[in-house]
Amino acid sequence: MSDNEGEQFFDIPKNALDRVEARTMCPREDGKVVRKQAPLKEEPRLEAEQKRSPKKQEKPRGMLPLEQLVLKYVVVVCSLDALREFGGLIAQIRQSHQADMTRHLEAVATEHRANLQALTKSQQEHEKVSKEILSAVISIRSNLNENSSPRHKPLDLDQVNAERALGFGVGYRTALNVFGKLRGITPEEAGSQEVKNMAIREAEEDEYEGSRSFFKKVLDMVKKTMR
């Protein structure tokens, strides 16, 4: 084998030795490749111990939850003082909660009473309005029934008195006119038909400011009486 053939045969890449030494775990003299240390065998044992379930602590029987909680975190010597302080704190919290709840309930009750009073007042107003509406409906219905009735409405008392006063005034004026024209006529001639007709004409010709239909009825009654 020539020198060239030997060089070609032993022409090894630079990193080949590194790979070989890494596989054989043999460090080089120049210290470029560090030997890996094998993992400790104690770690699996520690992990196994950690995975073991701890022993359950037996709870003392016949004790309140607060006592058990205090004994869990406080030394037995100080447990009585801790229980006393915790009990007082819980009592204060309970009293404060009860006071807040009482104030809240009183505020709610006051609000409910105010709402109830407002509702009662509103109902009374609605009842009043309903009564007024019902009264108006009854009045309208009564007026409609009276207007649709064929019977004539009776005259009002004041209206009747006014008509009588006007009739008396007309009759008085007529009597004065007739008396003025009958001067010089004897009582025997006063009852004659001619005198009666003259009185009727004076009554018909007199001016009357009232109802003509009412005056006509009165005049017809006078004619019937005098004839």
From Swiss-Prot:
Similarity comment text for this entry: Belongs to the novirhabdovirus protein P family.
Role noted for this protein: Non catalytic polymerase cofactor and regulatory protein that plays a role in viral transcription and replication. Stabilizes the RNA polymerase L to the N-RNA template and binds the soluble protein N, preventing it from encapsidating non-genomic RNA.
Disulfide bonds: none
Taxonomic placement: Viruses, Riboviria, Orthornavirae, Negarnaviricota, Haploviricotina
Superkingdom of the organism of origin: Viruses
Post-translational modification: Phosphorylated by host kinases.
Subunit and partners: Homotrimer when phosphorylated. This trimer is stabilized by binding to the L protein. Binds soluble protein N, and ribonucleocapsid.
Protein name in the entry: Phosphoprotein
Cross-referenced InterPro entries: Rhabdo_M1
GO cellular component: host cell cytoplasm; virion component
Protein source organism: Hirame rhabdovirus (strain Korea/CA 9703/1997)
Keyword Chaperone annotated: yes
Subcellular location: Virion; Host cytoplasm
Keyword Chaperone: yes
Pfam families found in the cross-reference section: Rhabdo_M1
Alphabetical keyword list: Chaperone, Host cytoplasm, Phosphoprotein, Viral RNA replication, Virion
Region (Disordered): 24-60
